[in-house]
């Protein structure tokens, strides 16, 4: 898994500036559960930042993401689900998103508050 993670990371950062790479490794998100999610906690380990939406055709993938997180979290794998309404497919509040995910998918993986993932107002991670 380490070789695969390193390969994916190497491919994903090819052509990016040093500053952009620093943004990827040193970013934080406000948790939908309260507090902060710091990506530095997974330094040297694989992690996934994934844009999500509660009302899109792929919402059922929450269950798959949770299963992936459950399977590898003890090995140090990190994940942040990032809800965004940039595509008009998200519930109207963080509380609704949290409740929806907990009730329908029994989610306990790290999840940020609703963020912008595109354009000038995008979270720095998504601009990197």
Predicted regions and their residues:
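Short pre-active-site segment immediately N-terminal to redox-active cysteine/selenocysteine motifs
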Residues: 45, 52-55, 83-86
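Cross-family detector of peptidyl-prolyl cis-trans isomerase
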Residues: 20-23, 29, 64, 84
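Structural microenvironment flanking redox-active thiols in thiol-disulfide oxidoreductases
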Residues: 58-123
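Terminal helix/beta-alpha structural elements that buttress the NAD(P)+-binding lobe
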Residues: 25-26, 113, 127
């Amino acid at each position: 898994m380490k070789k695969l993670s390193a390969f994916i990371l190497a491919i994903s950062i090819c052509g990016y500036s040093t500053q952009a790479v620093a943004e990827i490794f040193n970013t934080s998100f406000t948790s939908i559960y309260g507090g902060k999610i710091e990506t530095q906690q997974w330094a040297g380990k694989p992690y996934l930042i994934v844009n999500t939406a509660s009302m899109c055709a792929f919402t059922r993938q929450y269950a798959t993401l949770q299963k992936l997180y459950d399977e590898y979290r003890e090995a140090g794998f990190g994940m942040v689900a990032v809800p965004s309404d940039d595509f008009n497919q998200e519930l109207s509040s963080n509380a609704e998103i949290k409740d929806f995910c907990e009730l329908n998918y029994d989610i306990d993986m790290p999840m940020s508050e609703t963020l912008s993932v595109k354009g000038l107002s995008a979270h720095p991670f998504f601009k990197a």
